Amino acid sequence: MKLKYANGNTPLTEEQKQEMILDAAEHYGKYMDALKIDWRNDPNSSDTPHRVAKAFVNDLAEGCYNQGPKITAFDNLDEYDGMVFQGNIKVNSFCSHHHLPFIGVAHTAYIPSKDGKIIGLSKLNRIVEFYSRRPQVQENLTMQIHDHINRVCEGNLGVAVMIEANHMCACVRGVKHDATMKTSKLSGAFKKAAPRQEFYNFVGDLK
């Protein structure tokens, strides 16, 4: 089955992944042939097609082929009604336009309701990692992370996600600007000035 979109998800078995690696390696060798790279006779490149295919399936794009993180949500027994914030979560992804990396950090937050669900902080990291490991644009990554947090934190009063990243497609080609791109997705209470400002203050405190 093909992914409908580059940043989609179709979980594969280990056997299917190995078949994909072999198939992708064969095609990447042809890609290098088209670029007139004599990779078969270069000791530094002779295994490059297999290395690249393995890296994409098992690391760079593993979010396309693995099951999502198992997340257990707990009842908010203490009726905590403040913000839950986790910032500076590493983002290692790559754009679906040029297949070049973009690297940065994600800041996430949600406000549980007194009768809603809460999750462990490590689960926010796992959500970011799961969606980062696939080809996409930063805007979509921001929305995917937001929507997953919104689903698992049932009854929440609001979710906020911000991503700050440097894109290699801008740094090494074209205008070659070492600029930082910021994207955000806010919902619920974070649409209001005070919670939104508190979130931004938490992000600013990390600088």
Label each PLM-derived region with a short phrase.
Residues 1-207:
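A domain-level signal for the structural core that forms small-molecule/cofactor-binding pockets
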